[in-house]
Amino acid sequence: MKIKIINRSHHPLPTYATSASAGMDLRASIEEPITLLPLERRLIPTGLFIELPVGYEAQIRPRSGLALRHGITLVNSPGTIDADYRGEIGIIMINLSNTPFTIADGERICQLVIARHEQAEWVLTDELADTERGAGGFGHTGKE
């Protein structure tokens, strides 16, 4: 799939790390380092603008290494970039650790995954088909 992209950062375009990778790492495009204090969140620019085909979205997901080693994740995860959005891709990062974390220019801060999606059409009804689970909610399917 070919996707139009504008790169206003001075970093290379995102690439897949392996032939089986689902996501590409995005990099911070900042003039000076940004320090996130514990529980602080900030919008981090990437310098990237994309034009997705209709029927696709770009999902923004945390990087597992940043989450495990530093407690850094994304506030709205996954974030969605719609096919009709043309603004800069910005990443809402949060520091869930108890120590400050500094983001450097060019640092890999998240993953971008391209995914196909459908738009639903609601069918108003008075009842739904029965299932084994029924209306069982949170934790209903067991602990194991």
From Swiss-Prot:
Gene Ontology terms: biological process: dUMP biosynthetic process; dUTP catabolic process
Reactions accelerated catalytically: dUTP + H2O = dUMP + diphosphate + H(+)
Record-listed substrate binding positions: 63-65, 76, 80-82
The keyword Cytoplasm is annotated on this UniProt entry: no
Function per UniProt: This enzyme is involved in nucleotide metabolism: it produces dUMP, the immediate precursor of thymidine nucleotides and it decreases the intracellular concentration of dUTP so that uracil cannot be incorporated into DNA.
Membership in a protein family: Belongs to the dUTPase family.
Protein name: Deoxyuridine 5'-triphosphate nucleotidohydrolase
Organism this protein belongs to: Porphyromonas gingivalis (strain ATCC BAA-308 / W83)
Lineage, top ranks: Bacteria, Pseudomonadati, Bacteroidota, Bacteroidia, Bacteroidales
Gene this chain is encoded by: dut
